[in-house]
Regions:
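ATP-dependent carboxylate/acyl-activation modules
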Residues: 1, 5-259
Length: 260
């Protein structure tokens, strides 16, 4: 802890004396050891975090894990990408319609493989699954709602034949009840919650600079936080689009703009 604090204050001093754009230093605490890296042989692997100054309520270290195996590197990148996607969709709906619907997304290897909005959490979940019944197999699901028995049942059973539950790697939500946890039987299935998912808005977009390690250094770039505004003068087209088509456009934009 003392070494961490010293490193952090040395970094702040160097940035102040050298000019904020001339020096980049970062000190983070080890938050958790990951099950394995991007591939099983890439171990050890870990997640570091620093939320002591201007904490991010949607930071990966702010999620509580209720059951399942330890997160892997791919689980962490999937979660990060899903947070990026769901916050962009929420921002788009708030800007264009003044409210944020229930949003359900599924992802595999950091890209969405299903996405839907609904008037209820169950409706959003079922629509997301119905987009491609096979694509969600083994994937990660995120929903900006509290999961109770109806939501858990939809996630595990909707459009499934027989008694088997849908095979998933992780479920992420704003919260989950004990009753819902009780019907999630698969030991490996990771379940994580963060109440910040329940209050998504345009302010939920990532604000910190985007960092990318490159050989010999680091690239720093502002976050791509453009939010599509369908009323903007620059947007032109032929004919009129109805309200449902506008909602479809915002959903498609939110997913497409945050996919690799």
């Amino acid at each position: 802890t003392a070494e961490y604090e010293c490193a952090r204050y040395i970094g702040i001093s160097a940035q102040y004396l050298g000019g904020n754009d001339q020096v980049y230093l970062s000190a983070m605490r080890r938050h958790t050891e990951l099950k394995y890296g991007e591939n099983p042989y890439q171990s050890p692997s870990a997640m570091y975090a620093d939320n002591r100054i201007n904490p991010d309520p949607l930071g990966l270290d702010q999620f509580t894990q209720h059951k399942g195996h330890t997160l892997s590197y791919i689980n962490a990148t999937d979660l990060d990408r899903l947070i990026n996607s769901i916050t962009h969709i929420a921002a788009g709906f708030e800007k264009n319609f003044g409210n944020v619907p229930f949003i359900a997304l599924g992802a595999k290897h950091s890209n969405s493989c299903g996405g839907a909005v609904g008037e209820t959490a169950v409706q959003a979940i079922e629509r997301m699954i119905e987009g491609d019944l096979r694509a969600i197999f083994g994937g990660v699901i995120i929903i900006n709602a509290v999961i109770d028995v109806p939501e858990a049942t939809a996630i595990l059973k909707h459009k499934m034949d027989g008694e088997n539950d849908r095979l998933l790697d992780a479920i992420i939500a704003g919260g989950i009840t004990d009753e819902a946890l009780a019907i999630i039987k698969r030991v490996k299935l990771r379940v994580l919650t963060n109440p910040a998912l329940l209050t998504l808005s345009i302010d939920s977009l990532e604000q910190r600079s985007k960092l990318r390690p490159v050989r010999g250094g680091l690239l720093i770039n502002p976050q791509p936080n453009f939010v599509l505004d369908l009323s903007a003068e620059e947007i032109t087209g032929t004919g009129e689009i109805n309200e449902q088509q506008k909602r479809d456009i915002i959903l498609a934009w939110g997913i497409g703009s945050t996919s690799q």
